[in-house]
Amino acid sequence: MSCRAGFVWESPQHFNRYIEDCGVSCELVTPHMLAAPFFRSMLNCLIIPTGFGNPAYCRLLPALRASSKRIEKFVENGGNLLVFGAAINRADAYDWLPFPVTYHHDCHPRRIDCSLSPVTGSLVEDYDPENIECDGIFPMHEGDAAGNSSEGAILIEKTIGKGKIIVTSIHEFPSRTFLKTFCSSGELTPF
C-alpha cells in the first residue's frame, strides 16, 4: 500500500528525506499552501515538526490557525495528524487543534513510559526509553496520555472521526516503523 505524507514547513528539511527513506511519499506543504483555499492534495498523514510555534524558527502558527477547520476535517475524514513540540512557552500554541492542549517548553532528556499504546509506543523504539530528548510536556490536554515521563504527558493520542491525532514533545525523529505504520494507517484523504 502506498501512502503520502504532507510535511508542513517553509522549506525542505532533513525530516522530508527521512520520511521518504521510510517508504512514505512526502510532499512539502508550505504555510502559504496550507492556508490557501485552492491548494488540494490527497494525503494519508500530515506532519507538523518541532518548532512550529516559535517565530524564531518559522511563520507556521498563523497558517495552522487559518487552516484549523480544514485540518480538523482532514482528520475527521480519515487522515492522520502528527504534531511535535511548539518549542516556545505559549499558552495558545496548540489552539488550532480540535481539542485543548497545554504545552510547557522545557528541553532535556527524560525517561518515557509508552507501554499504554503499542502503535504510539513504537514512535521511540529506536531510542533508549530511559533517556529520550524531549522539548517539553503537556500538563493539560483532552487526549489519552500514551507516553509519560515523571513530569507529565509526552505523547497524546486522540481519535477524531475516522482519523487520529498524535501530539508529542519527543525531540527526535520517530522510528521508521512508527512513521510507516502511522502514515499508512490513515486513509488517503483530500486536504
What label would you give each PLM region?
Residues 1-45:
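Aromatic-Pro/Gly-enriched surface loop or interdomain linker
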